[in-house]
């Protein structure tokens, strides 16, 4: 076997053993490894110098190569990888110098493509380790296919090693700290050189410039390389563990709620408060957050890929996401006060709204109050200023209010017939809820199912923009005053109409409510329900008032669900109910208007 074959087998063996199982033994005995590596390097240098003088020593070199152990091979590969890292960090000076020398030596114009490709490969090997590029110098074009196959395999392994080293952050960290620790490296090298005091000077110089720096890095490199294979999977496992803990906390908190007594009402009961509180405390422990930090997380406007809102909604799965979102933000707010507004605060709110009306998040931060509180205070009380009347509504004001709202409803009806209702509703919502979009980043995915599959006409409550109504009233009444007054007028009119409702219509309503299986009054869309009645003789408001009056005849109706109440009422003979006296009594109690 020739010297070239020996060198090829050594590089191949070194690369694969270093990347594979050979690395496991690299740290067992550092002192022995260092000495063996140094001895081997010096021995190879002597063989290179004496090769031309004594060709008969090839057989001895071949025998010596067969006895080379795994640690020697690991040292060679470590030197190759360390050299590649150093060259990559410093801008590959070896590649530049190799390119320059190659250009000088190949000045003939008759160089073919095959030789040019071969030189490029040698240059890349020189970038990994300058010593590797010289291994092909003695190869001839007549090499057999097996030798070329080995050469290509070694070349690919070296390229893969270089890519791994350049891409992984742990190697980059190792390189970044290499220059900062130069004094420590010099001391470490001096300790390694102490064992070479009996070596000839010219051999010692070669050793210091070549093998020793690679050996000094061997241990550090051996400690870094395993992270290439395990760091990413370790981080993924850690994230999965945290996510599992949070999901378990949500499931545990949800068990506090009794499914038989769960409520869809507007207010959260004590058990729901307890369940939410328990989950948030567990989330704080898992994430290591303080009370202030969890409040800041809840009020963060950033759209994070976070598991907080997803899991807290699992605690109360029967509630909408937006209701949980708003409730939690109100309880875990980051603002200083939520008490009664003082005249000074109203004046400051007016000053800020004159500049930034609609930017409720910014205004809330300045005033130290929740954005929703600032918005409602401005729209309902402060906006009208001294023009807002606080006395009883006059007949002229009532008529003006009716005209404004009827005109708005007529415009909406025309837009609906022309197919423009979606645009109209979007515009109304944009005006009414201006400033809310920057506070709400949780969308409802559990909307109530529609009673009918057909496209429904928008209800009056979805059309009327009370801010616009207040403005068209000349600012003499706030939006909340206009809304309360309108609802009171509708109720008075509806109570007068349902005095003459037939028993058939009453029976139809109760049967429909019973069959739909509602458990809470808030689940009923009364306007949509009215569209299902044949002939549509009654509005949603009138049907709601009818049910509210009929249910009072059931004992302890406040403790029963709407489904149970309707089952009892349908069982009454001919659904005959004493409505007239109750309606007349209720109507007399509404004669006194309140602002």
Curated annotation (Swiss-Prot):
Locations listed in the record: Nucleus
A single MF term (Gene Ontology): transcription cis-regulatory region binding
Domain of life where this protein originates: Eukaryota
Listed SMART domains: SANT (SM00717)
Listed Polar residues bias regions: 163-176
UniProt keyword terms in alphabetical order: DNA-binding, Nucleus, Phosphoprotein, Repeat, Transcription, Transcription regulation
InterPro entries noted in UniProt: DMTF1_DNA-bind_reg, Homeodomain-like_sf, Myb_dom, REB1_MybAD, SANT/Myb
Signal peptide start-end: none
Sequence ranges of Low complexity compositional bias: 75-84
Job of this protein: DNA-binding protein that recognizes sites within both the enhancer and the promoter of rRNA transcription, as well as upstream of many genes transcribed by RNA polymerase II. It is essential for cell growth. May stimulate or inhibit transcription. Specifically recognizes the sequence 5'-CCGGGTA-3' or 5'-CGGGTRR-3' (where R is any purine).
Name of the protein described by the UniProt record: DNA-binding protein REB1
Species the sequence originates in: Kluyveromyces lactis (strain ATCC 8585 / CBS 2359 / DSM 70799 / NBRC 1267 / NRRL Y-1140 / WM37)
Taxonomic lineage: Eukaryota, Fungi, Dikarya, Ascomycota, Saccharomycotina
Gene for this chain: REB1
């Amino acid at each position: 076997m020739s010297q070239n074959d020996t060198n090829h087998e050594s590089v191949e063996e070194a690369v694969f053993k270093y990347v594979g199982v050979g690395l496991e033994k690299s740290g067992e005995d550092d002192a022995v490894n260092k000495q063996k590596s140094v001895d081997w390097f010096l021995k190879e240098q002597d063989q290179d110098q004496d090769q031309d003088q004594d060709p008969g020593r090839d057989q001895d070199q071949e025998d010596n190569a067969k006895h080379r152990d795994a640690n020697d091979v690991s040292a060679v590969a470590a030197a190759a990888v360390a050299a590649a890292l150093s060259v990559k960090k410093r801008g590959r000076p070896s590649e530049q110098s190799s390119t320059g020398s190659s250009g000088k030596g190949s000045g003939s114009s008759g160089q073919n493509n095959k030789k040019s490709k071969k030189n490029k490969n040698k240059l890349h090997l020189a970038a990994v380790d300058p010593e590797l590029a010289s291994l092909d110098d003695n190869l001839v074009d007549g090499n057999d296919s097996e030798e070329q196959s080995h050469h290509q395999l070694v070349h690919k392994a070296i390229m893969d090693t270089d890519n791994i080293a350049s891409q992984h952050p742990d190697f980059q960290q190792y390189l970044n700290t290499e220059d900062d620790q130069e004094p420590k490296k010099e001391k470490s090298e001096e300790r390694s050189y102490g064992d070479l005091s009996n070596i000839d000077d010219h051999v010692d110089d070669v050793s210091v410039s070549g093998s020793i720096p690679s050996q000094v890095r061997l241990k550090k490199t051996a400690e870094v390389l395993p992270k290439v294979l395990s760091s990413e999977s370790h981080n993924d496992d850690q994230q999965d563990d945290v996510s599992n803990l949070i999901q378990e906390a949500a499931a545990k908190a949800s068990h506090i709620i009794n499914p038989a007594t769960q409520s869809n009402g507007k207010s959260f009961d004590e058990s729901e408060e307890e369940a939410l509180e328990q989950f948030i405390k567990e989330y704080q422990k898992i994430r290591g957050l303080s009370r202030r930090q969890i409040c800041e997380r809840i009020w963060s406007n950033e759209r994070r890929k976070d598991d907080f809102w997803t899991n807290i909604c699992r605690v109360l799965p029967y509630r909408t996401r937006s209701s949980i979102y708003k409730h939690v933000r109100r309880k875990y707010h980051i603002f200083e006060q939520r008490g009664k507004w003082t005249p000074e605060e109203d004046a400051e709110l007016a000053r800020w709204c004159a500049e930034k009306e609609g930017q409720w998040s910014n205004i809330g931060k300045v005033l130290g109050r929740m954005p929703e509180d600032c918005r409602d205070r401005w729209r309902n009380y402060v906006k009208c200023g001294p023009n807002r009347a606080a006395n009883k509504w006059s007949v002229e004001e009532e008529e003006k209010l009716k005209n404004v709202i009827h005109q708005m409803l007529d415009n909406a009806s025309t837009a609906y017939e022309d197919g423009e209702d979606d645009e109209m509703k979007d515009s109304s919502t944009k005006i009414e809820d201006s400033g809310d979009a920057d506070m709400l980043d949780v969308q409802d995915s559990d909307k109530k199912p529609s009673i009918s599959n057909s496209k429904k006409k928008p209800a009056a409550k979805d059309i009327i923009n009370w801010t616009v109504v207040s403005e068209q009233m000349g600012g003499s009444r706030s939006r909340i005053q206009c809304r309360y007054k309108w609802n009171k007028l509708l109720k008075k009119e509806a109570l007068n109409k349902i005095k003459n409702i037939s028993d058939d219509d009453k029976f139809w309503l109760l049967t429909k409510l019973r069959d739909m299986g509602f458990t809470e009054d808030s689940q009923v869309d009364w306007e949509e329900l009215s569209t299902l009645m044949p002939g549509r003789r009654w509005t949603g408001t009138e049907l709601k008032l009818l049910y509210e009056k009929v249910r009072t005849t059931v004992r302890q109706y406040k403790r029963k669900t709407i489904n149970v109440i309707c089952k009892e009422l349908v069982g009454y003979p001919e659904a005959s109910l004493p409505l007239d006296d109750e309606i007349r009594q209720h109507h007399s109690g509404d004669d006194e208007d309140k602002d």
